Every structure is written in structure tokens, then in C-alpha cells.
Regions:
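Non-catalytic alpha/beta scaffold blocks inside enzyme catalytic domains
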Residues: 1-239
Length: 239
């Protein structure tokens, strides 16, 4: 799928070539980054990046600071692409910062075409991996929570939607958006941290933290994980 870490996190340790596209695993997924460093040391793994220079704890080749460099890899015009296509267990890791743009669909398409040219691509193994930064993104997409009306610049389109329809907005623990984008709407906040958007909500419904309830989660691989409650919810929080 185009939103999961398809090859599995464990398989990273077997990789002998890794292409990072718009992703900083040291910042976005430290455990995954530790596995990348491990395969770099043990397998002499070649690592190439598309994007700005990064402060990583292993050596890499910066193929291009622009996403245009993906086409050069697809057409095998770079030294790293030769390593990528000649390796036995290559993988591609794409960050959501690269695909959450107006060009995201095109970027994902090119990455998919590169993946199909890799030697280990098959019906049973997909070397193309999406590294989601939002912990609940994979589970939400698996349940079918999608809305193409907000593709591209999310906050601009959100402002347009609120200005047009004056809706009731439910914020399910969401704190990353600018609260000014919600002006003109009736905001109901469900969450447990009480960050800035909770302070501007019309109604606050406190919910338990993940440590305060037994739940089912889905990791970036799309694998189901179950947790057990450590203690009862505090204050007025309710499931």
C-alpha cells in the first residue's frame, strides 16, 4: 500500500542499499534510525538521500537537494542509482513531508516506478516504504478516513471550508494546526494534553491517555498492536 512501511521495520537490518526521500529518520523515527545505522555498520549499506543535508549518525550520499533528482535515479543516471539497482536487498523510505505537497502524487508515482525496477520487488515483497510522522495515520487510512477535498495546502483549504460552511469542528487530540484556521467554527476538542487548540475550543471533552485505557493500535507497518491499561483515567477523562 501507498501509506505503509511495506517491507517491515525488521527487514531494514538486511538492506544493503537505502534511498531516503524527504525523510530524516533520526528525527522522525529514532528506533528505525538505529536499525539503519546497524545495517550501515554490519552490511556496508549504501545510503542515499533526496533532500537537504541531514545530521545523521552514518555516512550517506546526497543525490539531490531537489526532488527532481528522483527522475535521475529512475533513469539510472547517478552513481547511487547504480548501487541501488545492483544491490540484493534495497529499500526506499519516503517521508510524509515529501508527499504532503501539491506534487505528492507525482513523487509517490516516481518512487513506485523506482521500486518496481529493484531486484527484490515481487508480489510478496514491496521495497517501497512510507514513514508516517503521525502515530495514528496508518490506522486512520486503514479504516478509510480520507478526504481528497483537503489535498495540498491543508490549512488554506480548511479556512475556505470554514468560511463557506461555518461547521462544527471536532479536534481529536489535534494540536499541530494553527488555531486561527478555525475562526468562525464551533470547536469541540477531544484529547488529554490540553495544548493550545484546547485553550481555544468552545467545548473540551477530556479523554484518557493511551496509558489509561486498553486499546488497539496500528503501527507504521499496518500491524495491529494491543495495549493494556496501566492505571485508571485521571480527573474527568472518559473513554
Amino acid at each position: 500500500e501507498s501509506y505503509k512501511f511495506n517491507s517491515s521495520i525488521q527487514e531494514v537490518e538486511n538492506a544493503d542499499a537505502i534511498l531516503l526521500v524527504g525523510s530524516n529518520p533520526r528525527w522522525e523515527a529514532s528506533v528505525l534510525n538505529a536499525r539503519i545505522r546497524k545495517t550501515y555498520i554490519n552490511n556496508n549499506c549504501k545510503i542515499g538521500i533526496i533532500g537537504p543535508d541531514l545530521d545523521l549518525n552514518y555516512s550517506y550520499t546526497n543525490i539531490s537537494k531537489s526532488l527532481i533528482g528522483l527522475n535521475d535515479i529512475l533513469e539510472n543516471k547517478t552513481e547511487f542509482s547504480k548501487d541501488l539497482y545492483s544491490s540484493k536487498n534495497p529499500i526506499i523510505i519516503v517521508g510524509t513531508s515529501a508527499i504532503n505537497t501539491n506534487q505528492g502524487a507525482s513523487i509517490l508515482k516516481v518512487c513506485g516506478e523506482i521500486a518496481k525496477k529493484l531486484p527484490n520487488f515481487s508480489k510478496s515483497f514491496n521495497p517501497l516504504n512510507i514513514l508516517n510522522q503521525d502515530i495514528s495515520r496508518v490506522g486512520s487510512l486503514e479504516l478509510g478516513f480520507t478526504n481528497n477535498n483537503f489535498d495540498g495546502d491543508f490549512e488554506i483549504k480548511l479556512k475556505e471550508e470554514i468560511k463557506k460552511n461555518k461547521p462544527v469542528v471536532f479536534l481529536l487530540g489535534l494540536d499541530e494546526i494553527n488555531f486561527k484556521s478555525l475562526d468562525g467554527s464551533f470547536v469541540i476538542y477531544l484529547g488529554h494534553h490540553g495544548d493550545i487548540n484546547a485553550q481555544h475550543a468552545d467545548i473540551i471533552l477530556p479523554t484518557p491517555a493511551y496509558t489509561e485505557k486498553s486499546s488497539t493500535f496500528m503501527n507504521i507497518e499496518g500491524r495491529v498492536i494491543q495495549t493494556s491499561r496501566c492505571h485508571h483515567p485521571l480527573g474527568e477523562a472518559k473513554e
